[in-house]
Amino acid sequence: PGDVLSTEADRPWREALRHHWPEYAIEAFYLAVLVLVVGLLGAAMERLPGEAEPMARRFLVGLGAGALVAALVYSPWGRRSGSHLNPAITLAYFRVGKVGTADAVAYVVAQVAGCLLGVWALRAILAVLPAAVVPLPMPAALAPVTAAGEAVAALVQFVLAGAVMLLVLATSNSRWYRATGVLYAILVAGMLMLVPPLSDFGVNPARLLAVDATGRFADGRWLNLLPPLLGMQLAVDAYRLFLRREHVMCAKLAHNTHGRCIFRCQHPQQARALAIASIRRRGRSRGA
């Protein structure tokens, strides 16, 4: 393990909120975009001819969602915020000490707010479209009870969430770290293609909260928030136990090559960013 290159995560609450709000805003905005686009894709697939196979529809939705996730992760803003896009991922990184307390709370709030914004925007758009008679389309997020049963759905959530976090930890802390975003996007696409018949809840608690914001948690569906949270926490233990690793470089799926990092960062890309910033400062001081 190298030295911690960024201590931004150690700022007091007020300072963190004042200085790190751009990263929080990015998380909220990107999740709103993701929910809106996936929802519109789902609506479009519902409009395919009746003989279209459900698997074909899910394939197209998954393909579009996976491409969008990859684009968000590797975008300049995505590299800045880390593109968690999921409270369970943020809390897993918080557990390994890479995210400060203030940032973890603010990220979760921003993620839920972004999902709410995306759901409301989706409903508003569908309400004014001529073909707005389809139910709110959000693959892997809507059905209150699956055909496979709630127990199976919860197990699928738990396993998939653990697989997602283990993949992120294993790849982002290896020589393959540049491929983490691509592999994550492929896994997201695969889940949207293959998992809905078993689990329509997904592995993102923020999305489930946003969809159920109308008060349907009275029937106990809030328990569906637990499997993805527990699955990703267990993935941290699996990373340490089975892969025999303790070191986590940073809390980003794709790291930026310039600018600050608000996490407790030990990533080589941050070292490069600091070196570039130092060279630029020296150049400006010489020219002054």
Model-derived features with residue positions:
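Membrane-interface helix-loop junctions and terminal tails of multi-pass membrane proteins
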Residues: 1-288
